[in-house]
């Protein structure tokens, strides 16, 4: 059985992945799979910068709006569902294109991730259960920053599991999870979009301003009123920062500035993950040659396969 070619577009938030993916899909007869851990959730639209039907421009998209925020969508589930989507697109005679910024999820598709077969240490786990989730996440960040960049602070169960695996095996959870041999069913081309840090941060600030103009506060308030504030999906950047505002503990401007700050930090962690964990062909974003360079690399890859 021949390998399935897959184009993968990665990079930090607000760098321009979505628009590039649409252009490549048009020119290469592709369909797009979202590689974003947040865009799978219905109702989380503005805060996740979810692509709109207009922006899709007729290109079929997968793994967007497939579940409710109260229903966890894990990396293991993403691996299974994305592989199904790849097969569906390939069997239809089209090119699968994955686009997103969730490194752990995307990497799990192409490498045979082990999602935790190490045995448990119930005594150690019980000790960790007594600690505050912030303290636990800080422990993880100190011991294994790569895992901390991918596991949300509010996902206490996952943080504890990562610490438990390190306690039992003596090596970082991020190293334990991944098998560095590519799954032989796929032949991926990883294209990464990079941008000058100052320009990227300015884009992020502008994107957050636009989110507020488009109704982010209303979207977050709806989630708040549905008592979903402790659901991991809703604790993502863009929502959790507004909850103190709803409770009268911060101003709206403070909430906006915090979203911008957290988004910038997240972009930095994304870049660290992609540069350290994946073999990526980087392209300069935000210049006139971005699209043509990406298209040339993709065409060369597809011709040579």
Curated annotation (Swiss-Prot):
Main function: Catalyzes the transfer of a dimethylallyl group onto the adenine at position 37 in tRNAs that read codons beginning with uridine, leading to the formation of N6-(dimethylallyl)adenosine (i(6)A).
NCBIfam families in UniProt: miaA (TIGR00174)
Gene coding for it: miaA
Assembly and binders: Monomer.
One of the GO BP terms on file: tRNA modification
Pfam families the UniProt entry points to: IPPT
Reactions catalysed according to its record: adenosine(37) in tRNA + dimethylallyl diphosphate = N(6)-dimethylallyladenosine(37) in tRNA + diphosphate
Gene Ontology MF, one: tRNA dimethylallyltransferase activity
Signal peptide residue numbers: none
Residues that bind ATP: 11-18
Stated name of the protein: tRNA dimethylallyltransferase
Binding-site residues for substrate, renumbered to this chain: 13-18
Transmembrane segments: none
Organism: Listeria monocytogenes serotype 4b (strain CLIP80459)
UniProt region (Interaction with substrate tRNA), positions on chain: 36-39
Keyword list, A-Z: ATP-binding, Magnesium, Nucleotide-binding, Transferase, tRNA processing
Residues with site note (Interaction with substrate tRNA): 102, 125
Alphabetical list of InterPro entries matching this protein: Dimethylallyltransferase (IPR039657), IPT (IPR018022), P-loop_NTPase (IPR027417)
Entry's family note: Belongs to the IPP transferase family.
Domain of life of the organism encoding this protein: Bacteria
Enzyme Commission no: 2.5.1.75
Root EC class: transferase
Necessary cofactors: Mg(2+)
SUPFAM superfamilies linked to this entry: P-loop containing nucleoside triphosphate hydrolases
């Amino acid at each position: 059985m021949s390998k399935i070619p897959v184009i993968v577009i990665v990079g930090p938030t607000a760098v321009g992945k979505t628009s590039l993916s649409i252009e490549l899909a048009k020119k290469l007869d592709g369909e797009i799979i979202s590689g974003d851990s947040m865009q799978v959730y219905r109702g989380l639209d503005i805060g996740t910068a979810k692509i709109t039907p207009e922006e899709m421009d007729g290109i079929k998209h997968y793994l967007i709006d497939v579940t409710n925020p109260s229903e966890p969508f894990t990396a293991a589930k993403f691996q299974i569902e994305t592989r199904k989507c790849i097969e569906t697109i390939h069997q239809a005679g089209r090119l699968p294109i994955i686009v997103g910024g969730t490194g752990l999820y995307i990497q799990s598709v192409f490498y045979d991730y082990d999602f935790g077969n190490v045995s448990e240490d119930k005594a150690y786990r019980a000790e960790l259960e007594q600690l505050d989730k912030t303290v636990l996440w800080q422990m993880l960040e100190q011991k294994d920053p790569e895992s901390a960049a991918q596991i949300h602070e509010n996902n206490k169960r996952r943080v504890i599991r990562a610490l438990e695996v390190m306690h039992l095996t003596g090596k970082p959870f991020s190293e334990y999870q991944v098998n560095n041999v590519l799954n032989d069913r796929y032949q991926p081309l990883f294209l990464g979009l990079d941008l000058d840090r100052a320009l990227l941060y300015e884009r992020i600030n502008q994107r957050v301003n636009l989110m507020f103009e488009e109704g982010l506060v209303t979207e977050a308030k709806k989630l708040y009123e549905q008592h979903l504030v402790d659901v991991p999906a809703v604790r993502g950047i863009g929502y959790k920062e507004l909850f103190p505002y709803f409770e009268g503990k911060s101003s709206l401007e403070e909430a906006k500035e915090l979203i911008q700050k957290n988004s910038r930090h997240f972009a930095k962690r994304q870049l660290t993950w992609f540069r350290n964990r994946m073999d990526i062909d980087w392209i300069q974003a935000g210049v006139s040659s971005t699209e043509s360079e990406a298209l040339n690399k993709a065409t060369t890859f597809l011709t040579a396969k």
